[in-house]
Amino acid sequence: MAAQCCCRKAPGAEAAPARPPPEPPPALDVASASSAQLFRLRHLQLGLELRPEARELAGCLVLELCALRPAPRALVLDAHPALRLHSVSFRRASAVSESPCTFAFPAPGSGPPLPGFADAPGAESASCPLAFRLDPFTDYGSSLTVTLPPEVQAHQPFQVILRYTSTDAPAIWWLDPELTYGNAKPFVFTQGHSVCNRSFFPCFDTPAVKCTYSAVVKAPLGVQVLMSATQSVYVEEEGLYHFHMEHPVPAYLVALVAGDLKPADIGPRSRVWAEPCLLPTATSKLSGAVEQWLSAAERLYGPYMWGRYDIVFLPPSFPIVAMENPCLTFIISSILESDEFLVIDVIHEVAHSWFGNAVTNATWEEMWLSEGLATYAQRRITTETYGAAFTCLETAFRLDALHRQMRLLGEDSPVSKLQVKLEPGVNPSHLMNLFTYEKGYCFVYYLSQLCGGPQRFDDFLRAYVEKYKFTSVVAQDLLDSFLSFFPELKEQSVDCRAGLEFERWLNATGPPLAEPDLSQGSSLTRPVEALFQLWTAEPLEQAAASASAIDISKWRTFQTALFLDRLLDGSPLPQEVVMSLSKCYSSLLDSMNAEIRIRWLQIVVRNDYYPDLHRVRRFLESQMSRMYTIPLYEDLCTGALKSFALEVFYQTQGRLHPNLRRTIQQILSQGLGPSAEPSTEPSTDLGGAEADTNPDSPALLLGDEAPSSTISLRDVNVSA
């Protein structure tokens, strides 16, 4: 269904219909070079051809636009040096036609797909070429300025057609068959968050702008194509995939994946897609569960709006854990090893269907509006499904990591604010850190306590989603809606309570001003603290004997991970402690999932415990995932094991994605001192051998304020 411009009139009408009230322009986004505030984007249409052998995507993009002001001289889009623009043209849209663009594909290799139009009688069908230029903007993109013809008038629909090819684009990840599990077919996926999709197609690359989209995709025979769309059809006789997203989404949520993917239904509105060898595991771990989580979310926050909720498992090269692309969550296949991490990650992406996808932060300076609310909703869903104790354990684990990051960055770091102020040139993707999630969660949790508990707050969030669905908001929209929904709180001036002012929550650096009381999870967290205290007690022999009697194999994954994180925080440990830990746990931990193994191996590396380095080597030889390789290489290069890191890298680099390989090379080069030269010679000496039980009213633990400042480029050069 093609979106219509507000100025279209019915055939035969004597006069133009009354113009609707003007829509507010999008929020200003310093991460976008575009002129989004001057135009209304109604719909975008993509014609794409995937060329894996050349690692090239050929595209034709049609933007359906209305100018918001008279006689605009130019249209400015976000683009990228990876885009090669072949032509840009203009076409006046028909006032009566509702037919979207159709795409005719030429013979393979003869050029990008060509647009064709279903013309209405009497409509101007001819397009005219437009002048354009690409200019530098930041290190993550360019600006594309298109000169518009003088006849463009305010509120009159028109189309801009762009033909381009994209190679070596940050948004498009091409994998040779050797980098997949099946080693059979090439694989490609896109990752648009936060500002990468400007290298996928020219766009208004800001979360403030949403539109519907459609796409037609041509791919090599036998390659399955999926997109983040509400409708998809494969026309076998054409060899083309057709997609349509009927709800407005920001550019970063337009996503594509193609490869040797097979489906399996796991519920009435869900299926998993994965490489054939992974499909049985993915199906067994999620069958029935996703519908349970969706139903819980609907009880809390209203109907699921996106039709289907499918999940595609991507190869280990996927640069993040998961991405909430509407209708089609992308998730890294490595997470299948860990049941509990898989559960939490998928539920978090489910929560984004309401918070982030339906209601979106208007700028990247307020990412907490999506991530903080999604984290809160995720924990409400897990509480409904698995109980408060499990939710408190997972929250304790994450808040523990938040405070660890706080110690790393310092309490005055501007990236610890919820409402950040970006200087031009800062890549918003670098600001994805635990403050966005966990400090945002703590503020949302605080709001829920102000109104009397989670049930009343659920009612508010349901109304908030209904009011703002398919739009983008700023923090003030959320807070104004909150105080309007609870007028008694507005009368009490809860937004100005000393030390807990809303403005202070948003703009103060440092830890959260208040944190939830997690005592309902004490039955799960107390054993962790007790075991950690045993291992740090004196005398070691007696402590080790007592500790070894505790069977952690029966623990939840988050308990074991929290225990190992405590040991990591205490590193470097005495060598005799590490030796006893290894004797007690190393074989057991070897049999556990990667989330556990990497933590134990970081303890090994940070304590220079050579007898277990063979486990580090084996782990890095088997892992191709960014989230499991980067932390170990960083630790290896920080300590005394740089030559060991080099040796392992030289032996495994051929199995790594080029982007990951470059990142590790940077770590290795930074980790080498002036006297240390890279060597391919093997290093033979290193590689061998009880509490409040009311879930509705937990107390709040207050924190302190820290000064605030502006985020600049130097502030994001810290590993988050």
Curated annotation (Swiss-Prot):
<feature type="binding site">
    <location>
        <position position="348"/>
    </location>
    <ligand>
        <name>Zn(2+)</name>
    </ligand>
</feature>
<feature type="binding site">
    <location>
        <position position="371"/>
    </location>
    <ligand>
        <name>Zn(2+)</name>
    </ligand>
</feature>
<dbReference type="InterPro" id="IPR034015">
    <property type="entry name" value="M1_LTA4H"/>
</dbReference>
<dbReference type="GO" id="GO:0006508">
    <property type="term" value="P:proteolysis"/>
</dbReference>
<dbReference type="GO" id="GO:0004239">
    <property type="term" value="F:initiator methionyl aminopeptidase activity"/>
</dbReference>
<keyword id="KW-0031">Aminopeptidase</keyword>
<protein>
    <recommendedName>
        <fullName>Aminopeptidase RNPEPL1</fullName>
        <ecNumber>3.4.11.-</ecNumber>
        <ecNumber>3.4.11.18</ecNumber>
    </recommendedName>
</protein>
<dbReference type="Pfam" id="PF17900">
    <property type="entry name" value="Peptidase_M1_N"/>
</dbReference>
<dbReference type="InterPro" id="IPR016024">
    <property type="entry name" value="ARM-type_fold"/>
</dbReference>
<dbReference type="InterPro" id="IPR042097">
    <property type="entry name" value="Aminopeptidase_N-like_N_sf"/>
</dbReference>
<feature type="binding site">
    <location>
        <begin position="321"/>
        <end position="325"/>
    </location>
    <ligand>
        <name>substrate</name>
    </ligand>
</feature>
<dbReference type="InterPro" id="IPR001930">
    <property type="entry name" value="Peptidase_M1"/>
</dbReference>
<dbReference type="GO" id="GO:0070006">
    <property type="term" value="F:metalloaminopeptidase activity"/>
</dbReference>
<dbReference type="InterPro" id="IPR038502">
    <property type="entry name" value="M1_LTA-4_hydro/amino_C_sf"/>
</dbReference>
<keyword id="KW-0479">Metal-binding</keyword>
<dbReference type="GO" id="GO:0008270">
    <property type="term" value="F:zinc ion binding"/>
</dbReference>
<keyword id="KW-0862">Zinc</keyword>
<keyword id="KW-0482">Metalloprotease</keyword>
<dbReference type="Pfam" id="PF09127">
    <property type="entry name" value="Leuk-A4-hydro_C"/>
</dbReference>
<dbReference type="Pfam" id="PF01433">
    <property type="entry name" value="Peptidase_M1"/>
</dbReference>
<keyword id="KW-0378">Hydrolase</keyword>
<dbReference type="InterPro" id="IPR015211">
    <property type="entry name" value="Peptidase_M1_C"/>
</dbReference>
<feature type="binding site">
    <location>
        <position position="352"/>
    </location>
    <ligand>
        <name>Zn(2+)</name>
    </ligand>
</feature>
<comment type="similarity">
    <text>Belongs to the peptidase M1 family.</text>
</comment>
<dbReference type="InterPro" id="IPR045357">
    <property type="entry name" value="Aminopeptidase_N-like_N"/>
</dbReference>
<dbReference type="InterPro" id="IPR027268">
    <property type="entry name" value="Peptidase_M4/M1_CTD_sf"/>
</dbReference>
<comment type="function">
    <text>Broad specificity aminopeptidase which preferentially hydrolyzes an N-terminal methionine, citrulline or glutamine.</text>
</comment>
<keyword id="KW-0645">Protease</keyword>
<feature type="region of interest" description="Disordered">
    <location>
        <begin position="671"/>
        <end position="708"/>
    </location>
</feature>
<dbReference type="InterPro" id="IPR014782">
    <property type="entry name" value="Peptidase_M1_dom"/>
</dbReference>
<feature type="active site" description="Proton acceptor">
    <location>
        <position position="349"/>
    </location>
</feature>
<feature type="site" description="Transition state stabilizer">
    <location>
        <position position="437"/>
    </location>
</feature>
<dbReference type="InterPro" id="IPR049980">
    <property type="entry name" value="LTA4H_cat"/>
</dbReference>
